[in-house]
Amino acid sequence: MKVKMSKLIILSGPSGVGKGTIESLLLKNKNLLIKLAISATTREKRRDEINGVNYFFLTVQEFKEKIENDEFIEWSCHFNNYYGTLKSQIKFIQSQNFIPLLEIDTTGAKNIIENYKNKGELSQLLTIFILPPSIESLKNRIQKRLTETNIQINQRLEKAKAEIKIKNLFKFQVVNDNLEECVAQIEKIISKEIQKT
């Protein structure tokens, strides 16, 4: 497969839509030549997460210093926690001849899309928005995680409704109704789009 290493793949969508599961399945497909750009965050580490594998867990002070030093390709703050993608992660992945996959929230994705558009480099982005089959199914997925209170779940659902409204900023939209079909559709999109570069 012909690959342009300056390309970025952005996978985004509401919290609870299955981005993490989809991402892990995509990464198993070695033919795609993608590697996950690990995000940095200030949120509390979940019991099954590992620093440097799932996220780079930073203090608020460390995160703010990196913002000041322009070390992020994108960053945002949600539910009192900072999230961002370090430029060094992107460069590291590209130096290994892989395409960085960013699994990020819609605010971060929107910031990157606007930044690339302003620089006339939108063609370097492959943007994919993952949709839930319905808001009710999204609510069920979030509840099954057992990590949020009812208030937090309702906040996430309200945020999801707003995020879905910007889905057309993304080149592709895929509904995660059936996980295997969703992943297969995204694999086809990535293979086809990367060959165009």
From Swiss-Prot:
It comes from Mesomycoplasma hyopneumoniae (strain J / ATCC 25934 / NCTC 10110). Its main location: cytoplasm. It is found in: Cytoplasm. CDD domains: GMPK. Its EC number is 2.7.4.8. It comes from the Bacteria. Residues 6-191 form the Guanylate kinase-like domain. ATP binds at residues 13-20. SMART domains: GuKc (SM00072). GO terms for molecular function: ATP binding; guanylate kinase activity. Essential for recycling GMP and indirectly, cGMP. This is Guanylate kinase. InterPro entries: GK/Ca_channel_bsu (IPR008145), Guanylate_kin-like_dom (IPR008144), Guanylate_kinase (IPR017665), Guanylate_kinase_CS (IPR020590), P-loop_NTPase (IPR027417). It catalyses: GMP + ATP = GDP + ADP. Belongs to the guanylate kinase family. Keywords: ATP-binding, Cytoplasm, Kinase, Nucleotide-binding, Transferase. GO terms for cellular component: cytosol. It is an enzyme of class 2 (transferase). It holds the Pfam family Guanylate_kin.
